[in-house]
Design a protein with these regions (language model features):
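Extracytoplasmic/secreted cell-surface and envelope-processing proteins
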Residues: 102-103, 176-178, 198-203, 226-230
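Short, conserved loop/helix-junction motifs that constitute active-site signature segments
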Residues: 84-87, 105-110, 183-186, 208-213
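Bacterial N-terminal signal peptides that target proteins for export
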Residues: 3-16
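Core dinuclear metal-dependent hydrolase active-site scaffold
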Residues: 31-91, 99, 115-185, 189, ...
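Proline-aspartate-enriched helix->loop->beta-strand connector
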Residues: 189, 196, 205-219
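N-terminal signal peptide c-region/cleavage motif recognized by signal peptidases
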Residues: 25-26
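Short, aromatic/basic amphipathic alpha-helical patches
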Residues: 106-107, 227-238
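Histidine-centered divalent metal-coordination motifs
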Residues: 90-110, 221
Length: 271
């Protein structure tokens, strides 16, 4: 074979190798928590119908949210014995700052229960795959009732669903250190407690929202409408506020706003 043809054949082989490698890498990049943001629209649009590439989000109450993936995986955050869904989720996450964030008697039909604190085997570090959902956690500390600190007593759970990264802060008691932010990665939707008392002061929670820089933040854990409105007044000059007009929204990457926005979802039962 002439040398010129051999050179062409070698180039073709190298090109094919590159194409194969890219094909293998692309799905992993799409599933990660640092996706490109160029496709974010200028305005958040709320949908009411589940579709491929979307996440159904329902605010059950207090710190419990029901997330449903395109593949039908049902997740309930801060699953507890006070505000329970009328169905059995596939996955339940819990934290233990207060009994309203965990259950002593979870539904035996739940397939995966993730307790976000040290239950006797050390601070948990979850990396779980369930159906089309990836779940991990970032451990944080909480104040103890008698004073002092319980290290790793709370977990920020991160749910990677439909090309969105959703972080639920649960009962966060402090602003985030650089190592927490590095573990979190790029977050698209932040669910944040705004009570201003049992977790963080509202100004400190505002600082956490600034730290995370999520396009969308959903307030939770506010107990009463007045507490929520106090928080919205505090942030009014810094973030636009949209109200869902109900307890349910459907989110997708294309719906994320370019400007960081606060989205208020009404709890089904108690804030």
């Amino acid at each position: 074979m002439p040398c010129s043809l051999m050179k062409v054949d070698a180039k073709i082989v190298r090109l094919l190798v590159v194409v194969i490698l890219l094909a293998r890498v692309a799905p992993a990049l799409a599933a990660g928590c640092s996706p490109a943001v160029a496709s974010r629209s200028a305005q958040l649009h709320l949908a009411a119908v589940t579709a491929p590439g979307t996440v159904d989000v329902t605010f059950l109450g207090h710190a419990s949210f029901f997330l449903q993936s395109p593949g039908g995986v049902k997740i309930v955050t801060d699953y507890n014995d006070y505000i329970r869904p009328d169905f059995t989720p596939d996955v339940a996450t819990m934290n233990h700052a207060h009994p309203t964030h965990y259950s002593l008697d979870p539904d035996p039909g739940i397939k995966l229960i993730l307790r976000g604190w040290d239950t006797g085997t050390g601070i948990p570090h979850f990396h779980e795959r369930f159906g089309d959902v990836q779940i991990r956690n970032v451990a944080t500390n909480i104040r103890e009732w008698g004073g002092g600190t319980e290290y790793g007593g709370n977990s920020i759970f991160v749910f990677e669903i439909a090309d969105l990264c959703i972080a639920h802060l649960s009962h966060l008691h402090h602003t985030l250190a650089p190592e927490h932010l590095a573990e979190l990665g790029e977050i698209d939707v932040l669910i944040a407690p705004v009570d201003g008392a049992y977790t963080l002061g509202q100004r400190d929670m505002l600082e956490v929202i600034r730290q995370v820089k999520a396009p969308l933040t959903i307030p939770m854990h506010f107990f009463t409408p007045r507490v929520l409105e106090n928080f919205l007044t505090l942030i009014a000059s810094q973030y636009p506020v949209q109200r869902a007009g109900g307890s349910h929204v459907t989110l997708s990457r294309a719906m994320l706003p370019r400007v960081p926005t606060i989205l208020v979802i009404a709890p089904e039962r108690g804030g």
